[in-house]
Amino acid sequence: MIPNDAEGAMDSLLKEIDHEMEVTIGTIDAQEDHSKQKEETEATNQQTWKLPLQDIGDETMDMLVKHNTKNNVINPNFNKKDVDTNESPKNNNDKNVVFNDNVQLLELSANMDESVLMSTPTKSDIDISPNKVLINLGDDIANESNEDNKLPLDNKTESEDSDLVSTMLLSKIPITHTENINDFYEKKSTDIRASTSRISSVSSDIEGTPLPTTVQTDQFELLKQAMKQTFEEDNNSNIDISPLKESLLSSELKTKQNLSIEQNEETSVDSIDNSVIHNSEYEVHARSNEREEENENDFENSIEDLEISTHVIEKSPSIEAISTLDPNTDNNKEHFIINNITKDSTFIEVTSDSKIQIDLKDSPENTLHTNEDQKEANTENVASETNIKETDQVIHIPTLTEEEISTITNITNDTETTEEGSKAEEDAKNSDVSNSQNSESINTTITNSLIGIDQNLTNKSSDITNDYEEPPKENELKSSPDVIEKGHSSIEHFDDEKITNSSALGTSNYISIPLDTLQEATPVTDSGKTFELQNQDSDNINSERIQNLNGSTPVEEKFNADDELLKTNQSHITQNKDKSNINEIDNSGTTSIVSDHVVAPILPPLPKIDKIFIDDPFGEEYDISNDSIDLTKSTRPGDYLSIWHIQEEELKQVSPASTTNSQFSNRILSNASSNASAESRISSTAFKFKPRIVSRSRYINPESRVNSFNISEEMILPQLYGALDPMRRSSRMSRTIQNSIKANRQKSEQYAGTRKYSIEIQPNQESRISSRIISNKLEEVSSENDKVETMNNSITMDGSFQLLPSFLDNSFGEQLDLTFSKFAKDVLSLRSSSLAQSEIHDNSINIWGEDNFIGNTSKNNDHNAMLDSKNKLLEVTDDEKSISESINKDIFADGILKSSIFNDITVSRGLNINGLDVDLSDSESVRVSLLTAETDASESGTPIKNTVKDSHVSSPFKVVNISKWKNQDGPESDHEVEEIAEIQIEAEKSSESIADISPIKMKPFVDTVVIEEPSQTALVDAGSLYLKLKGCLNIKLTGIKHHDARYCFEFDNGRNSIQTAWAVIPSDGDIRVNHDFESTVFEVGSKLYVTLKCKYTPPKTEIVEVVEKVLIPKKKLFGKAEYKYEKRFVQRDSKKDEWNNLFARDGSFGRAEVLLDHTFLNSVKYNKRNCTFDMMNEWTRLNDKENIENVFNIPRKPKYKVADLKMEVCYLDRVSNKEVFPVSFDKCEMIIKKYKEQLLISKEGYLMQEGGDVCNNLVRRFFKLQGTDLIGYHEVSNLPVVTINMLKVIDVVSSDDLKEEEGKQRSGNSKRNFTDHVLFGGCIQLVFTDEEVINLYADTSAQEKIEWYSKLKKTVDLNICHQPWVTKLAEAQKLEEC
């Protein structure tokens, strides 16, 4: 039932609350028929509610005070003097109103019976929309405001009280759920129709009621700014409005209410969306406290502020901004709570069933979109500006003279053949027209064009290198006639695409100009020269070397800038020719004029490699330490480019790559003849390949010191085996004949002209390009281009040829030269057939000959002084003859060059042939060659630099002669011998080592730094082994009782030993003991020895069994005498004791050995196990009757078993260095017992907690103590909230402990510390390792507190039992029990 007015609704609400607290839930008025059945079922759940006054919430008290004040003001019979006397005393204890943090301000207690809510009327009986309620309440307020003049109070009080009534009804009545409010109305109202007529009459009267309408303009601006700031901070923040002193127009209020009624009719009650804008919890409580103080002190100010704030909320156009927030926040409740920032602000709640529409021009969303659009626009502007900066580059071009402009004009006129030429022509013409305005652009165009050509040539060179990484096949070397005819035409012009690509590699200002145009326009210089380009802005300038097709060496140009001409922006050229050295361009900043005769490189130039190794790292001139490395296994150039360059340089003829049939032929860029004479093509480029240093070893090219193709080398006829055979060089006659032949050959001019031919060899296809293998002596080879080098061939002969004295004349030399000339032609014509010899080395071709053999010391035979030294070196002693006879005729360790063109070529030196890889055949012996080299060097009177030094690879090992090694004295000799022996063993096992090398010793040559990785903290030991000695059974000893024997056991783990006390050995020989021992296991795999020791007293006398002959008495006088034999024991002095040979000098009789390996330790890990070990005697000696005095010198018996050792073993491994192991296993079991006892500690009950997860407050929780876990449960839900680990608690303190401590510390006239008694009285403190403290209060009884303290204290005291080994051992024992 709805009450007659709003005042009746508040009275009914308060009365209903009082009625619910005082009377049981089951005794409710049975006026409603539909609630009678539920009242009967719930009649048993009767409960009386009584609540102290201090437990009523602050907001509830605020609401009650305001309501009573309003009633007292309106009531004409109210007397202010009787306020205190008329107050009902039961209101202090009977009100139980519970508030939570939600927007729903009023709700009943959770434990109240639900029958109160069951009396709600249906929707068909009454309109329960919130708009209706608000309108009705507003009508009541207006109606009452018209009747205020009838009250006996003054006008000022009437207006203020009227405002209080309207403000209270609109702001503090809990109408968040209109159905519940209508239920409250219905409980006290009995006439629905009367209430309806009352509301309609009030609504009709309120239309004519005028309201103050004066509102200042600056107040709206202030409200607007406050709304902006609130929405910008958070969508869920509060809307703070400053207080206004003027109310808004009443007509606008009526219009708003009518609009709300129309919207409510269209919208159903179920679809109400509730959204809340409220302050944080802290702010709400703060404001409520402020509100309480204000209401108690000054009610008039609050009434005025509430009235003004209410009108501002209803009339402000900015309040529509609330609809822009999320309508689903806070449980979809559409309550807007608007709080003022000022001191006089109050808590206001506005409710409606529809969303309030607000038009915010400066809303935060619009602002955000506007800011984002501006940012995007700014970003686009910045990007566009950046592009403009990138594209609009300022180009500074120097001016040109008239001659240069005319030259450039001629260049541009002839560029119509290609696309790039046409572009350059247009640029040149345009620049000619605008020359007066900006003549600098022409110079930059030409400069960039020349640089583009330079890059194009560089790319061409790189293309040539990339195209010819694969080895050329024989059929590829021959091209069709069409290609040959098109040679010049196809070579004269660059490919258009490649010109464009090469120019694109530079800056954007580069323009590609055809080379033909430059050739016609630029001045003509010497043909076949190298042109080099230079950019003004470049610091590092790369030079390109261009070679002629016929292999001629280009003359390089060097351009130096004149400083005076730089000021006038004119370029001059200074040419410096140098045939021997390779020069680079200086950074002068000027451009050069290109020669008209530009030639593409036949072969891409080789990179210049500077010296990166020390010539003689060990400082000894005649060091030949080559035993540690196989010289023939050294790395050699295996790429085609290096091979062709070396072949062309040494053979002095056109490379197979530069023939007309080669693919390199189409790279020529000039119309000049390609048949010009070639000088040298070995040069270097500005770009240097940086080699990777593998070690400190140094590679030296042997060809730089020994001319491989010298006319003075030995030439031997094929199929001849005689005096000139290397095996017969020991005779002086052969050497004389040989020298005569050499002298005759030097006079022959025809021989020199027939030596100029080339041998083409296809290298191993598996070889890779390696720049670091290229010789450092290429400059020396290129500088000797004027010399005519000839090939020196030596061909092995068979034994059919016999050298005669008549061959010493000149005719023999001419005939020999003719023979070799014919043979050389046959070699050229028959590459694969004539050079393809059988694998028999007698018929193999020796390219270098004997003089280049690794063991020979002769370097050049052109001088007579060298011939004398050679004669001395060729003298062979008897020892050398025996060596040569034991070795076959392949003594020179000829290397076999493997190629796909021919089978084998025997090589004496065995390093490389023009960069080709050479492998040693299986039949050669490197050891013999090394021995020969040492013998020759040792016999020479004057030391001559050996060719081995020129060709070998330096080694970090120093060779020491055996004599010096043996003669070394000092304490370090033996140690060095051991090290050398170990090195020799490792060298023999290695596959790359040389057999039977001399003893060597190491010299440090690389400073190695060993970086140790951080490892985990090492454990001090592996754990403890607990031994419980049960006894020693079946001891094999006799006469124990007579020797008064005693025993003891000794335990030795390798570091420490322990011994038991001496005890008497039982006579039966079984020792039964029960001793505990603890042995630390320092390392897994160690051994533990248990020794049985005995000591005894040797007996002084001994009892011996004696057989005596006893005479039997005669029966007759003259009868025969008879005897009998009797055995008896006779005591005598002992001469020998059997125990003397059974024991060691220290009394050891038996020893048991326990191997502490992983298998044994794992079997007894956390498991007590009985084990039996054999006691072995290894000290017993053989019986020797002759040597009784020297017992210990008698030979020993093999060890044998003398007893059985019984022990109980358990192993506990270590996990942490902080673990502490007891000294015996009995203590371990005691600790396990305490550990189990701690786990059984339990206690539960209610405690008040302070600290931990509870800050500045006391929380009552239900605690359970189980072992080391103290778990706190929620008082209502019984869910676990907090778990306290008692293992981290180091102390438990109570108030009694504080008293005891104070009594000990207090002395004399010292005062008591009452602060601790007040703060900690009745509490239990838990002190943690991090000094955190949690206080627990037992609010039940003192005995409960004592029990909690004792349980917690015992738990903390037993924390010492918690170690890793304790937990594992307890679990293992639990498994055994199961």
Curated annotation (Swiss-Prot):
InterPro entries: Bud4, PH-like_dom_sf, PH_domain. Residues 71-95, 361-441, 458-480 are annotated as: Disordered. Residues 1240-1357 form the PH domain. Its main location: other. The keyword Methyltransferase does not apply. It is found in: Bud neck. One of its GO terms (biological process) is protein localization to bud neck. Residues 431-441 have a biased composition (Polar residues). GO terms for cellular component: cellular bud neck contractile ring. Keywords: Cell cycle, Cell division. One of its GO terms (molecular function) is GTP binding. Residues 361-378, 420-430, 470-480 have a biased composition (Basic and acidic residues). It comes from the Eukaryota. Residues 406-415 have a biased composition (Low complexity). Gene3D superfamilies: Pleckstrin-homology domain (PH domain)/Phosphotyrosine-binding domain (PTB). Belongs to the BUD4 family. Required for selection of future bud sites. Cooperates with other bud site selection proteins to recognize a spatial landmark during mitosis and they subsequently become a landmark for downstream polarity establishment factors that coordinate budding and cytokinesis. Involved in the septin organization at the bud neck. PANTHER family: BUD SITE SELECTION PROTEIN 4 (PTHR36100:SF1). This is Bud site selection protein 4. It comes from Vanderwaltozyma polyspora (strain ATCC 22028 / DSM 70294 / BCRC 21397 / CBS 2163 / NBRC 10782 / NRRL Y-8283 / UCD 57-17) (Kluyveromyces polysporus). The lineage of its organism: Eukaryota, Fungi, Dikarya, Ascomycota, Saccharomycotina.
